[in-house]
Amino acid sequence: MAACRALKAVLVDLSGTLHIEDAAVPGAQEALKRLRGTSVIVRFVTNTTKESKQDLLERLRKLEFDISEDEIFTSLTAARSLLEQKQVRPMLLVDDRALPDFKGIQTTDPNAVVMGLAPEHFHYQILNQAFRLLLDGAPLIAIHKARYYKRKDGLALGPGPFVTALEYATDTKATVVGKPEKTFFLEALRGTGCEPEEAVMIGDDCRDDVGGAQDVGMLGILVKTGKYRASDEEKINPPPYLTCESFPHAVDHILQHLL
């Protein structure tokens, strides 16, 4: 971050950073209140494809997070924008709870494949239908390619391995719309009036959250909650600006050293 520029915006990952399923990270609500007590703009960015933005917002409010819908930017939003730009009819491999975010999108006689995290759809018959569409020239759109994510019972496969399987089988390359894509972070910052060099990203994924943000010029703070595993910070170059225990510790650092 350029020394002459003050911090103006903080982007915060949700799952694994503020909460894990229906449990908040300890101290996260109070830390968010402290961050909001400053002059920085706060936005929430997520690759979740398991639920619509409205369902996600309701989950966060039940956990007593003070968040409004217009502060959340999701990879589902980015995927819908791309579908509208391309004017294609997608085969939607997403969780049924995410379908409201695609309301109005024509899906009959599909000529594109959209993949999110949808364990109930990831079986041979459905994946083979997607495979055949791709062989016929349909574009493959990956909402994100996370390798795994954190559940209460442990780590679980993300959509990335399934996207990669279809890429391999069809000799094609998916268009990825979520983190760590540069366009995702730039779109999340749009409307804040902030440049990437004036922003910080806080997340539990060293590649998708921290690496992606730092690639566009932001500072990246990696938290050791959610999907974090020992030595994750050594997997990207440059390494995270900071690695700390949790979101409250990240906020402490911001308040003490970046404002």
UniProtKB/Swiss-Prot annotation:
Family annotation (CDD domains): HAD_PPase
Gene (name only): HDHD2
Residue numbers carrying N6-succinyllysine: K50
PANTHER family noted in UniProt: 4-NITROPHENYLPHOSPHATASE-RELATED, HALOACID DEHALOGENASE-LIKE HYDROLASE DOMAIN-CONTAINING PROTEIN 2
Free-text cofactor note: Binds 1 Mg(2+) ion per subunit.
Pfam families hit by this protein: Hydrolase_6, Hydrolase_like
Family membership: Belongs to the HAD-like hydrolase superfamily.
GO cellular component term, pick one: cytoplasm
Coiled-coil spans in chain: 47-71
Protein name listed in UniProt: Haloacid dehalogenase-like hydrolase domain-containing protein 2
Single Gene Ontology MF annotation: metal ion binding
Record-listed substrate binding positions: D13, L14, S15, T46, N47, K179
Cofactor list: Mg(2+)
Binding residue positions for Mg(2+): D13, S15, D204
InterPro entries listed in its UniProt record: HAD-like_sf (IPR036412), HAD-SF_hydro_IIA (IPR006357), HAD_sf (IPR023214), LHPP/HDHD2 (IPR006355)
Gene3D superfamilies, alphabetized: HAD superfamily/HAD-like
UniProt keywords, alphabetically: Coiled coil, Magnesium, Metal-binding
Species, as recorded: Pongo abelii
